[in-house]
Amino acid sequence: NGIAKVEVQREDASLGTIRLAVIWRDNIAAGKSSYEVVNQVERDKAYPLDQDRRLDTTLLINGLPLIHIELKSPRVAFLDAFHQIKKYDREGKFRGIYSSLQMFVVTNKVDTRYIAAARESKLNKQFLTKWVDKDNQPMIDLNSFAHEVLSIPRAHQMVMQYSVIDDSKKALILLRPYQIHAIEAVQEASRRQESGYIWHTTGSGKTLTSYKVARNLLQIPAIQKTIFVVDRRDLDQQTTSSFLSYAANDVIDIDETDNTHELVKRLGGNDKRVVVTTIQKITTMMRKFEEGKYQRDAGKIKDLRVAFVVDECHRAVTPQTQKEIKAYFKNSLWYGFTGTPIFKENKRKQVGDLAQTTHQQYGDRLHEYTVKEAIHDGAVLGFKVDYRNTIISDLLEEEIPDQAYEDKEHMLEVLDAILNKSQQQLNIPKGVGKSNEAILTVKSIPRAQAYYNLLKSILAGKERVKVSERVKQHLPDFPKFTITHSVSENEEESIGYQDHMKQVMEDYNQEFGTHFSLADLRGFNSDVNNRLARKQDKYLYRNEQLDLVIVVDRLLTGFDAPCLSTIFIDREPMKPQHLIQAFSRTNRINDSNKMYGQIVTFRSPKEYKKRINEALVLYSKGGFGKAIAEDWDTVLSQFETSLKTIRNFAPTPNDVLGLSDRQKRVFVILFREFDHNFAHLKSFSTYDNEMLKKYDFTEEDYEDYEDDEEEYEEDKKVGFFSRLKDKLFNVSEDEIDQEELEAVLDDYEEEEYEEETPVKKKP
């Protein structure tokens, strides 16, 4: 019911306990809620070897600390405040009453971020979030941030209305600003009885946003039911499980309807609830009403004041079907969510008066957050596209016949690239359990089957292509793979598909100890989803992991897997919206080893580059931003500069041993920049170890430098490094300004001394 209570033992034990209400979700800036700000709260040490601390600023709601703020001076990186919070948690300073914290804010007054409260081991700096306004303009200085986020009512809303507990991850989630603006835009439109759509780029958390929209619409008295519509073709498994995970600790009911009878029962009930279903079940229900079935409920359901929330709104509902449902549900509002709207540039073919664009189908755009903005804000990663071609020919690209790409030799070249030339994309050198995954998408089910069979033949030693020993050193059982697609029961061509899928399932069962059959295809697909998503702890272990999944279209839309780093494409270029959707399977934020979403194409490189650029222009509102990573020449130049810089400082790894402690600190900074550029360079297919000879540099040299860096690295200097990076590195310069470096070091050490000064107890 949105009320938090605490259990208190009475002094007279015979009277038992009493539950006291302490905070109310909807009592915002009025009623029973009170707000306080406390500064410099002293927290005693929890362990003998620690020290007492003073916490900067805490916001209390009804006496409970719910938002904590750590402040630094402008000369210090805001990340230092983040690392200080992690240190305080390690020291046990956020226990007791402070365990009620929901939100951390870190700032150096000019740069501010927030993050959901969690234990130190779960706090990831990559999820620090900046605030933007409704037009996606950043508001990151402390004054602007405090006015927008930390004032009342927004601060209360942030921790009580715009937070979600993900039950599957056992984690608290705070919504990002663009999600909040979208939710509020839908609420405003619903009060005006207007429909509309939300354009949020793929990978930006549309499922969570749509969950909150569906949930919050029920707070509007005029709306009796919210129907969340998902696509029957493969999406409902992950989306529904996400909904159920969000709702497990919420105050509303989420119902998944497995059949039409359940749908009628849910919609005919008197309670307010969110119903998750497919458009096919809705149309089946309408048809049964016309046939005279469920007459007791038909009239009531037809007159419902209902809001439809449609995930992947173009795939889930066609204009024709939506028109029919609107004609039946006279009192309906429609809110579509899409990462790739259909514009006049890529509109559907005209069929009568049916909608051709997203605007025509759903109404006004209520909020937008494009791929360009998401990459700029760090909500998703950028893309890096590797245009490969297996065919060397004097013919012009457009003159190469399609049959050339059907040849077995082409397929072997593709698989050789995946198996032996994609180690960096898949993070294979990180070893067992830490590698990333990939999808190979092809044009048809027979083509997917052919790739599956050929890959099995390679692993059986029957082909000229082998998995290299270098790969096997890191992952002896690479690759673990499968194929996934929908199989119809009744289509004549599906008989062969079913036979092949039986063999696929047998292989899968043998690999993972499962027991799937064709009768449980949905269960198999769901298991593949979960194994690829790796969101449950058991999938962090190598014996439960997949490396590669072969698909046609399945998983290319609406599927979320942060560990998935690469999509390999061996098919003709897709439409702009489908390209962006497919690419966006790869650019979820995961960890520091995943810098980009990697896309590798294997045919028609010039045509692909043209189509991809057109798609990015369309979905970035006319500009690329940093959607595509730098090209090879740029990255090579950055590598050369950082290698020269580190050699100027320490010509050989052995020279690091003779550095002073202060110089070793600088070495850590320089090596991190070099390490980043070297890893980036190796992610290109153009890279070959032999090219290092030109620089009189080897992998062994790199490993020796890395050993030195690990020996002297200090985690708390990460903020210092990030501050230095913009100040001191320039790809057009050969050396670092040492005087500037010394000055910044002095500033940092002075700030560090002030931070570490222990609290003096009053006598």
Predicted regions and their residues:
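Conserved C-terminal RecA-like helicase domain
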Residues: 273, 402-548
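Conserved helix-turn-beta segment of the N-terminal RecA-like "Helicase ATP-binding" lobe
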Residues: 234-259, 457-465
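Long, hydrophobic alpha-helical segments
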Residues: 588-698, 708
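ATP-dependent helicase/translocase motor core
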Residues: 1-225, 234, 238-249, 270-273, ...
